């Protein structure tokens, strides 16, 4: 056994790190943990990754470096033993509307190559395989017949451009040919009277009989080559006396159509050679949107589901369609969503009887809008057309993005577009069962290996419910990160350090085991895997744990624990006691040894009012009815892809907003919203998007604390003397702000050929305000000093009554402290008041919003929806978050939380578990009830894992 190697970091000082020394074992699986804001990311990304990136850039040529700029050294004394560093963060991979799961994982590139190499083209008319024929095919055809069977080798008449039929026949005579076949009759060329079309004439190349003699076979091959030459690539065998004929062509054609031979670009929707010419590879066009024409699919045709056919005048179209549809037994009373595809086609494109009618006498939705377009010169028709226009599936490629020729190429009976529309689970199973010839398997060996391995990686990280056609910009941050992880695994790099930011985000406990397996695979390739993580399973699975703390901001930044998993995984009470005495400041060790824990509530709140969603059918939801109780803490659970977001974000939230007459996106398909809907006066979706509408937004402005801070500074003697009103202390309006950077503290230089450059403003040195504004002090601090305080520091500072010397100071300070206290309550005491919203993590943004609502007074009954609020939270932070949740409920509000964290789930009053699996195996209501009832449900995967948390 060789000596263990380490990545050694000496004197790390980035952000709040307190000059710490850390040793990370090389080639191991290492977890870095700690409460939010303790300095984990500062160590992992701002120190470890930043130095790895800097060294990489420094290793490039001076020519390449001039485009990348000089990267500053991270704040530390030195780092030894650092391999090349790769960071995989929670960022959506691409905003490119063409980027998909398939392209970002490179699986689609391998599929394109596979279809180009072994794909077979089939004619859409006859379904026969299209192929180029050779003389070998001609020979093989003759071998089907018994020896001695006579046949004639023919070439279709090919007239060279500029020649007449007579001249061409004369040329054949000169070349030694004597006979032609005209309409089934053999005649001599010099006897031809010229009373036939050229396409009915064949040149007789040779007469022969079926034989296995070497000389006869050689003669047949020569004759076939001559026939292909004279017939411009075409040849015909006519067997006698049966008159059975077989056509051959060296051209890639069948059924009179010349097909395009498969190439990899033929399947590329990013290339003009493969993209659908109508939608240019996007899969959608601006057209008549089905969702706008039929917004409520639970209505029937008779009830008026077709919005544009309502009213006295337009209702004539509906009456006429119903009259004509009667012979076809069209179900006019059936809800639209229950109609078959055939019935929907009749409604949209016309009844079978309409095909015989004049186009202007047809009745369908398509014909209706054709009429509207013809009357666009009238204002009312232009308005109607714009009302129903939207992004809709391309009518030519039906959303496949590729030109129609690409779908003629198949492997195992499936086209590439059929494969990318399968879920990854089904696609992986399809490849396992795929039957290929020995030659095809040999040609596609490497490609098949890459495809199946990468599909397995996606399954291992819990993404089996996605399709390869899913747009990258529609993925969550956690899904994007796991896709990045599978791409890294696929590249098979070794000797690197991978740094991941909470890879378990969005994962059900069932999938965490698979993720650990993937991380282990990455490590066993010869890499060091460093994860910034709070998930207990991942911490216990790691080889080594580093805990930064003990608390957030200036109270953190120290190394409170570093050691192998064997230390904290021990169940020996003496060993646990010794560990706690040795590392008393580590909250992580206290939770892992169960000294501290999040208690299960003694009882659950009863409820008697609820909102009921009936017939939820969005995405994979199976027409389920769900009751969401009010005035209690409800958690929505289920594996990834089970339908949680579709139900809550896709249906409940927009439907409630519309009920409250607020602007909202169109909700997903559902039948009705019932129950105590009127008991809700507001609905708030607290997501992880940046706070505020402006990039200048920060925690102080978002929580309205900055108004009181500006008033306080304007109340100081110097400010009054200089005539500075509160407006002068705003960085959003002219007056006191630095006009060079418009109060941002930095300037952005647009670089035409590379990413924009952000530099500290030279005029104000990053302080945002003019010099005379910065001369105004309160308690020895100017406005810039206050903006650079953490929330904890600010609360302490503004609570100090010794500094409140002037009339109005006390009231302003009281307001500031009351506005900032909720931030402390949700565990964000470490963030700075003036911290730019773009630098806050998703979890931090969500908790700033939560703090805002906790701080609001006189709020009418509100339904709060949270999407994975524990993202980025340590056990210690989750405890605080749950207290904040209880505070909202005690004020009479209702809480609905989409969550995977079992510590949160066990504290719920009511659980709605969807599943049982993801994708097409999900979308059902598995169980709804208390945590104990969910644990008792044998089909609930959530219950299976929750069992260990409820004692």
Per-range role (PLM):
Residues 1-951:
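Conserved phosphate-binding elements of NTP-dependent enzyme cores
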């Amino acid at each position: 056994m060789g000596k263990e190697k380490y990545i050694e970091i000496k004197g790390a000082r980035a952000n709040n790190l307190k000059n710490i020394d850390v040793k990370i074992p090389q080639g191991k699986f290492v977890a870095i943990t700690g409460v939010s804001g303790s300095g984990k990311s500062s160590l992992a990304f701002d120190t470890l990754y930043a130095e790895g990136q800097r060294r990489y850039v420094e290793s490039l040529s001076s020519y390449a470096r001039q485009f990348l700029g000089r990267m500053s050294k991270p704040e530390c004394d030195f780092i030894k033993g650092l391999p090349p560093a790769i960071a995989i963060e929670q960022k959506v991979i691409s905003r490119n509307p063409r980027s998909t799961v398939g392209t970002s994982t490179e699986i689609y590139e391998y599929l394109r190559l596979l279809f180009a190499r072994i794909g077979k083209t089939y004619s859409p008319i006859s379904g026969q395989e299209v192929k180029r024929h050779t003389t070998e095919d001609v020979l093989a055809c003759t071998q089907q017949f018994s020896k001695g069977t006579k046949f004639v080798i023919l070439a279709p008449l090919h007239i060279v451009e500029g020649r007449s039929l007579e001249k061409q026949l004369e040329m054949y005579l000169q070349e030694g040919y004597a006979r032609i076949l005209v309409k089934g009759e053999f005649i001599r060329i010099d006897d031809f009277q010229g009373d036939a079309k050229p396409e009915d004439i064949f040149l007789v190349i040779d007469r022969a009989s079926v034989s296995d003699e070497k000389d006869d076979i050689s003669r047949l091959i020569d004759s076939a080559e001559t026939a292909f030459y004279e017939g411009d690539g075409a040849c015909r065998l006519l067997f006698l006396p049966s008159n059975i004929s077989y056509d051959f062509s060296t051209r890639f054609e069948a059924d009179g159509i010349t097909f395009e031979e498969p190439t990899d670009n033929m399947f590329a929707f990013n290339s003009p050679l493969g993209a659908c010419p109508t939608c240019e590879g996007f899969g959608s066009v601006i057209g008549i949107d089905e969702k706008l024409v039929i917004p409520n699919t639970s209505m029937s045709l008779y009830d008026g589901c077709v919005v544009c056919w309502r009213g006295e005048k337009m209702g004539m179209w509906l009456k006429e369609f119903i009259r004509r549809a009667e012979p076809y037994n069209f179900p006019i009373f059936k809800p639209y969503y229950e109609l078959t595809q055939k019935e929907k086609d009749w409604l949209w494109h016309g009844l079978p009887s309409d095909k015989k009618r004049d186009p202007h006498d047809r009745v369908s939705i398509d014909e209706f809008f054709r009429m509207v377009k013809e009357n666009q010169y009238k204002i009312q028709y232009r308005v109607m057309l714009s009302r129903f226009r939207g992004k809709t599936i391309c009518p030519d490629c039906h959303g496949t993005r590729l030109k129609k020729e690409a779908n003629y190429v198949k492997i195992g009976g499936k086209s590439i577009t059929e494969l990318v529309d399968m879920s990854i689970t089904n696609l992986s199973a399809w490849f396992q069962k795929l039957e290929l010839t020995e030659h095809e398997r040999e040609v596609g060996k490497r490609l098949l290996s890459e495809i199946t391995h990468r599909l397995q990686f996606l399954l291992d990280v819990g993404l089996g419910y996605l399709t390869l056609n899913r747009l990258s910009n529609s993925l969550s941050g956690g899904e994007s990160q796991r896709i990045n992880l599978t791409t890294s695994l696929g590249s098979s790099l070794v000797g690197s350090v991978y740094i991941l930011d909470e890879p378990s985000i969005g994962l059900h406990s069932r999938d965490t085991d698979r993720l650990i397996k993937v991380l282990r695979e990455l490590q066993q390739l010869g890499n060091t895997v460093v994860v910034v993580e709070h998930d207990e399973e991942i911490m216990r699975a790691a080889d080594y744990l580093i805990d930064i703390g003990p608390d957030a901001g200036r109270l953190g930044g120290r190394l409170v624990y570093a050691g192998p998993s064997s230390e904290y995984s021990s169940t020996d009470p003496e060993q646990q006691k010794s560990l706690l005495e040795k590392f008393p400041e580590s909250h992580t060790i206290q939770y892992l040894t169960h000294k501290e824990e999040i208690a299960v509530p003694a009882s659950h709140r009863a409820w008697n009012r609820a909102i009921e969603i009936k017939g939820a059918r969005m995405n994979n939801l199976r027409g389920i009815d769900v009751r969401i109780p009010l005035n209690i803490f409800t958690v929505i659970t289920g594996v990834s892809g089970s339908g949680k977001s579709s139900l809550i974000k896709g249906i409940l939230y927009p439907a409630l907003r519309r009920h409250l007459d607020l602007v909202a996106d169109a909700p997903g398909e559902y039948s009705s919203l019932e129950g105590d809907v009127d008991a809700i006066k507001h609905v708030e979706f607290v997501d992880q998007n940046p706070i505020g509408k402006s990039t200048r937004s920060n925690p102080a402005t978002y929580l309205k604390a900055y108004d009181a801070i500006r008033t306080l500074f304007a109340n100081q003697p110097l400010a009054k003397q200089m005539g500075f009103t509160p407006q002068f202390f705003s960085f959003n309006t002219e007056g006191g702000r630095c006009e060079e950077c418009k109060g941002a503290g930095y300037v952005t230089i647009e670089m035409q050929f590379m990413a924009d450059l952000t530099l500290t403003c030279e005029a104000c040195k990053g302080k945002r305000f003019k010099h005379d504004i910065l001369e105004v002090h309160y308690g020895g601090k100017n406005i810039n000093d206050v903006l650079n305080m953490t929330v904890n520091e600010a609360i302490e500072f503004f609570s100090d009554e010794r500094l409140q010397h002037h009339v109005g100071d006390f009231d302003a300070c009281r307001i500031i402290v009351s506005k900032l206290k909720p931030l402390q309550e949700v565990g964000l005491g470490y963030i700075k008041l003036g911290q730019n919203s773009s630098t806050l993590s998703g979890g931090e943004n969500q908790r700033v919003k939560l703090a805002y609502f906790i701080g609001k007074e006189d709020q009418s009954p509100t339904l709060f929806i949270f999407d994975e609020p524990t993202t980025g939270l340590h056990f210690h932070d989750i405890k605080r978050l749950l207290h904040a949740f209880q505070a909202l409920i005690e004020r009479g509000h209702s809480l609905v939380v989409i969550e995977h964290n079992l510590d949160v789930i066990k504290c719920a009053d009511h659980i709605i578990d969807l599943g049982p699996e993801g994708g097409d195996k999900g979308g059902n209501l598995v169980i709804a009830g208390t945590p104990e009832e969910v644990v008792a449900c044998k089909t609930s995967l959530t219950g299976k894992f929750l069992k260990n948390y409820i004692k």
